[in-house]
Amino acid sequence: MSSRVRHAEASPRPSWLSSARFYEVYPQSFADSNGDGIGDLRGLTNHLSYIRDLGCNALWINPCFDSPFKDAGYDVRDYTKVAPRYGTNDDLTALFEHAHTLGMHVLLDLVPGHTSEEHPWFQASSRPDPTERVTTVDADRTLPVESVTPVGQTTPRIASLFDPRRRGSDCETSRGVVQESAIQESVSDRYIWTDSWISRGDGLPFIGGETERDGTYIINFFKCQPALNYGFAHPKHPWQKPALGPEALATCEAMLDVMRFWLSRGADGFRVDMADSLVKHDDDGKPFTIRTWQYIFSQIRPEFPEAAFVAEWGRPYESMQAGFDMDFYLDWRWDGHPNGYNMLLRNTDTPLEHEGDASYFNADSGTSIAPFLEQYLPQLHDCERASGTFNLITCNHDTLRTAQRLTERELKVAYGMLLTMPGCPFLYYGDEIGMRYRPLPTKEGGYVRTGSRTPMQWDADKPNLGFSCAPSESLYLPVDSAADAPTVASEAAREDSLFNWVREVLALRTEQPALASDARFDVVAAPVDGRVFAYIRTPAEGHAPTHPRTTADSSSAPAPAATRDDVSDRNGATGRPLLIAMNPGRGIETVELPSELRPDASMLLALGSPTVSGRTLTLPAQSFAILG
């Protein structure tokens, strides 16, 4: 296997990602259209114009597939059926169509590593008689039926009956004649089963005594989530199948057919849950999981070249090799040790409290941006040389909302940065109005995450803040009952609100080629002993992606860089380099304007009255500026 794989030579990254600005929606908490207390797809469709007008042109919808909801939909019972509480498959198709008319793209949330224990695959796989471990499926939906070996591959691929070229007649394969209407397939090895009811999991979490099958089964997370079988890196027991072996490839093909099902109906791609966890006992660097994804992408990309895939992986050197278009800078903190992203917004062991928070954007922390850059820049470099994107989030469904511990002014500075950095920005629903985390009892396996999943707050003059007309006791989760709970209506009406600041930043990002996801990024100022952070973004057109500067220098003087002329954007207009600068602290900071910035550069966006005198930008306390 090559040490570095780029699928872009055969299939470029989806063109629309260069200008993508994502909005993450937790469907059960966004908008309820039928009054049952749970958000649904029609409610989301009715609010697509709101998301577009906010400045986002792409959606990530958390799982909306049929599920018993023991883990909020990350326990899938049927990958090709919308959960009835959200609506129907037709409702989701209508959402795709309406989004596309608005110039928006939609990513679904794919959970490839496990299913619900109620999935028909698992129900069949758990039967005691091996001959009964089969499922019957429509021939145009799923199922591997024959082994073929593509040119250049030593492992067989499993052909899919989804291929329309195969429909319309009976197919004779190495496994017999298959009727066009439905076929049966064995799912005995669709999951990872040991060979005895007393067997343990070889270091992996396992469940025994729950089924009639003589064996225990491996789980990924909760008890209700049996792991799908993508094989083992180094099998050492008979029940452990090899990665990319026939059993693992059959699982790959089943998941490919899930992708095909929704992509053919209008989805524009997938955010992939726990993308790095497919192959068990994988080596450092995840080489077998990487090869598995390379195989999957080798099949799906020729069919859907504009489909985008973002990994929940968090290590772009690996995810880019695997073939993903995007990775997230995930928010992690282990035993008091923050990662770079955590240093920005949640650098504390008591995340609900402002005091003692050493986050960069806490005005009183006194911390520098340099430690963040030390971790961020090498990972950005990994993405850039693979022509992928490394995405920053404001928050997501798994993290605590930042508005609980940062003030509105601190959030404005933070979002100014997060929405102008390289990669595609991901805005979590409600963050634009400063929705707060609320300590709540666990719901559907949410535990501490539950408080970040509360209903969207639309209008204080409407029942349940406009989320639903259902009785309050019927709501999926309670709305914020505080008298000062922010709503879209209240924040839109307040000129200096966080909501209007986010709209301004996103509007500028929409207009400026220098703020595209693939525009060049160069650090200008990041002193170890200061609070200022400044960087220049240069439109990517006309030059190959280049490496950002990798030093967080101890002085605030700009690092040297070649002077650049205006660069033409996609529509033939000119796009100038932009300087983005911020001071989240309490003192005054200065930045020397870099040579790339035109002498006639103007202040395009400002917070806190920054000023320019000659070639010096002065940033008062808690200020932010974009010049270009």
Question: Which residues make up each language-model segment?
Answer:
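Conserved alpha/beta catalytic core and glycan-binding cleft of carbohydrate-active enzymes
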Residues: E117, Q123-A124, R133, R141-E146, ...
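Beta-strand-rich binding/interaction modules
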Residues: G587-L607
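Acidic/aromatic-lined carbohydrate-recognition and catalytic surfaces
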Residues: S3-A250, S264, A275-A322, M456
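An active-site-proximal structural segment forming one wall of the substrate-binding cleft
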Residues: A248-F270
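Loop/helix patches that line or flank the sugar-binding groove of alpha-linked glycan CAZymes
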Residues: L17-S18, R301-E303, R315, M320-G323, ...
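C-terminal beta-strand-rich structural cap/linker in extracellular carbohydrate-active enzymes
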Residues: G614-G628
